[in-house]
Amino acid sequence: MAEHPLTKFIPNLITLMSLIAGISSIKFSIQANWKLAVLMIMLAAFFDFFDGWMARKLKKSSQFGAELDSLSDFISFGLAPSLLINLCFTHELGRIGWVISLFYIVCAALRLARFNIENMKEQSKVFYGIPSPAAAGVIMIPLYLNFIDQVQFTINYPLICAVLTTFAGIMMISRVPTPSVKNLKVKTLYFRLMIISVAILLIFLISYFWQTTLLVAIAYLLISLLSLLTYFFTFFRRVS
């Protein structure tokens, strides 16, 4: 059966949907519609996961697609979340808050540039540093908490955001090995358990969306911290 000529455009179309979601997040951030801004970044992450998966399934990977994906990631997970956090919280820190936002954006750009030139085939189960969608999820932790509590922004939020944004920026450009599930191969038994776990997660997301999102983000943050501590422990043990 002949392949439809439009099939090759499907992965890039999904990437463009991620880009549109990221730009929409910027619009909602400017309008101070924080929940929609966060949801647009989450939607961008959803599309970002599936564009690569679809490209591999259809065997339609291309240099053009890779460059478009990086541009989309920079806007959706570099520029959009940094602007969101600055407009919502860290603007209260004045110039320092703006510098931290710029630092995160620059780190996202550097990570994506490095990702493009490195041979990622050697990293089937490990990322070096944290990917930009995960970094965006981490720096939005205070927003998830605020949505749950339904409280007014407190003086602690800007400081927490500044620390998380700086940490996420550093981790994006670091050489710290962190787990990756994109290309993880699992045995049949573990695959079934993974499917059950995902189903349970979806149930909790439907019932307790922001609470579940917060727990997942905190869990990833703790894993990243553990990876960083393990990296330093291994490094100092080698040099001592």
Label the predicted regions.
Residues 23-26, 43, 47, 81, ...:
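Alpha-helical transmembrane segments of polytopic integral membrane proteins
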Residues 124-240:
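C-terminal membrane-associated helical module and adjoining short loops/tails
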Residues 9-16, 57-112, 142:
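Multi-pass membrane catalytic core of lipid/isoprenoid biosynthesis enzymes
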Residues 1-19, 54-74, 113-134, 177-191, ...:
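Interhelical loop and helix-boundary elements at the membrane-water interface
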Residues 20-24, 79-80, 195-203:
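Hydrophobic, membrane-inserted alpha-helices
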Residues 24-40, 79-99, 141-160, 206-211:
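Helix-coil boundary and interhelical linker segments in multi-pass alpha-helical membrane proteins
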